[in-house]
UniProtKB/Swiss-Prot annotation:
Database matches in Pfam families: RNA_pol_A_bac, RNA_pol_A_CTD, RNA_pol_L
Catalytic activity: RNA(n) + a ribonucleoside 5'-triphosphate = RNA(n+1) + diphosphate
Enzyme Commission number(s) from the entry: 2.7.7.6
Entry protein name: DNA-directed RNA polymerase subunit alpha
Organism of derivation: Leptospira biflexa serovar Patoc (strain Patoc 1 / ATCC 23582 / Paris)
Length: 325
């Protein structure tokens, strides 16, 4: 099969628009349009599944507490038992990005006397950033002497403690369940959108929540790259690597040009011109967004003016009620 012109005639988004006024380090919303019917749903579903399962993150993978041999122990001077401490540690969200992605890091902690052990205590150097520093880990009294090592690793998805037992080398090390994924929730919606006179294209709106260790924008980019790399194996022909020139759709350009014109260029009657002026409609793009009902509700708008405007708009391939363009 020839690779030439495979995408000819396909409507594709030229860029992704992130809604900057609502985006935060933990939340992002973006819109991509137009897609051919069915493709918006396919891409939205694929991105969602990949985001939820395949984005790398960091988590605590194992702990070793001095004087403790198993997770069903108690520690003198600590209110919580080891099982509760482990449950709390599983909730710690960490940003850890070593140059060697395979490298793990061991944190050594010594906590003595009365106080609270919080997630912030794990940020022992600049390579570790805790995204939920106020998370409570344990309560210590004046007799406490908590000495522990915690191993941090990078990975994907969820890895149960059972799968790590075979890799334990140091006696007394307790593996714990690791939730590596930095993605907390992903939602997407596909709606209809208009291109020129056709309204059967798709608009993809996606919302992404993360723990803050990766931005929603970067997470979406990583998911797209993962999908692209997996799909490459299905291409059974050589692709020419060349810089793509952005193709300007002639119909789209004509529509944009028409909508940006001043209503005076319609050469309307004095009566119709005065009505548009009273409604503060200066450009054709503003005019076509109005419905016929909205126009006829105007005090001085007559049936004759409506017919005149409809005829002028029709001659340009436009009509009332064009809200999506």
């Amino acid at each position: 099969m020839s690779p030439k012109n495979l995408l000819k005639g396909f409507k594709r988004p030229k860029k992704i628009e992130f809604t900057t006024d609502v985006n935060t380090p933990n939340y992002g919303k973006f819109v991509a349009e137009p897609f051919e019917r069915g493709i918006g749903t396919t891409i939205g579903n694929s991105l969602r599944r990949t985001l939820m399962s395949s984005i790398e993150g960091a988590a605590i993978s194992a702990i070793r507490i001095e004087g403790v041999s198993h997770e069903f122990s108690y520690i003198e001077g600590v209110a919580e038992d080891v099982t509760r401490i482990i449950l709390n540690l599983k909730q710690v969200r960490i940003k850890y990005e070593p140059e060697d992605k395979e490298a793990s890091k061991v944190i050594h902690l010594e906590l003595k006397g009365a106080g609270y052990f919080r997630a912030a205590d794990l940020a022992v150097d600049s390579s570790i950033e805790i995204m939920n520093p106020d998370l409570h880990i344990a309560t210590l009294n004046e007799d406490a002497n908590l000495i522990m090592d915690l191993e941090i690793q990078r990975g994907r998805g969820y890895v149960p403690a059972e799968d790590k037992k075979k890799d334990i080398e140091v006696l007394g090390t307790i593996p714990i369940d690791s939730i590596f994924s930095p993605i907390q929730k992903v939602l997407f919606e596909v709606s209809e959108t208009r291109v020129a006179q056709r309204s059967d294209y798709e608009k993809l709106t996606m919302e992404v929540w993360t723990d803050g260790s990766v931005s929603p924008e970067d997470a979406v980019a990583q998911a797209a790259k993962i999908l692209k790399d997996h799909l490459t194996v299905f291409i059974n022909f050589e692709e020419e690597i060349e810089e793509e020139e952005e193709e300007l759709d002639e119909a789209d350009e004509k529509l944009k040009a028409a909508l940006s014109k001043h209503v005076e260029e319609l050469e309307l009657s004095v009566r119709s011109t005065n009505v548009l002026r009273s409604l503060e409609i200066d450009f054709i793009g503003e005019l076509v967004k109005r419905s016929e009902d909205e126009m006829t509700k105007s005090k001085h708008f007559s049936e004759q003016s409506l017919l005149e405007l409809k005829a002028k708009l029709s001659s340009m391939g436009l009509s009332f009620g064009m809200r999506d363009f």
